[in-house]
Swiss-Prot record:
CDD domains: Hfq. Belongs to the Hfq family. This is RNA-binding protein Hfq. The lineage of its organism: Bacteria, Pseudomonadati, Pseudomonadota, Alphaproteobacteria, Rhodospirillales. GO terms for biological process: regulation of DNA-templated transcription; regulation of RNA stability; regulation of translation, ncRNA-mediated. Gene3D superfamilies: 2.30.30.100. SUPFAM superfamilies: Sm-like ribonucleoproteins (SSF50182). HAMAP family: Hfq. Residues 11-71 form the Sm domain. The gene is hfq. One of its GO terms (molecular function) is RNA binding.
Length: 84
């Protein structure tokens, strides 16, 4: 087994948007839309900050996390003119 700890896509995604302070829209399973910046997360919850207020959102209530800008986690970014 590798000494390197493998990460799941959820952790890689959330850590990327946290580090880059990417604004996100989070849709809950009941249809509620939350917007803000992810400041922290663990296996069960996400902290979302907006306008100086922090919300604790349980992951089991989240349907979708949508960043405000496109992100590229595992693929090289595509340049504006179509070149790689």
């Amino acid at each position: 087994m590798s000494a390197e700890k493998s990460q799941n896509v959820q952790d890689v995604f959330l850590n990327f948007i946290r580090k880059n302070k990417t604004p996100v829209t989070i849709f809950l399973v009941n249809g509620v839309k939350l917007q803000g910046i992810v400041t922290w997360f663990d296996n069960f919850s996400v902290l979302l900050r907006r306008d100086g207020h922090t919300q604790l959102v349980y992951k089991h209530a989240i349907s979708t996390v949508m960043p405000s800008t496109p992100i590229s986690l595992f693929e090289p970014p595509i340049k504006e003119n179509g070149e790689e």
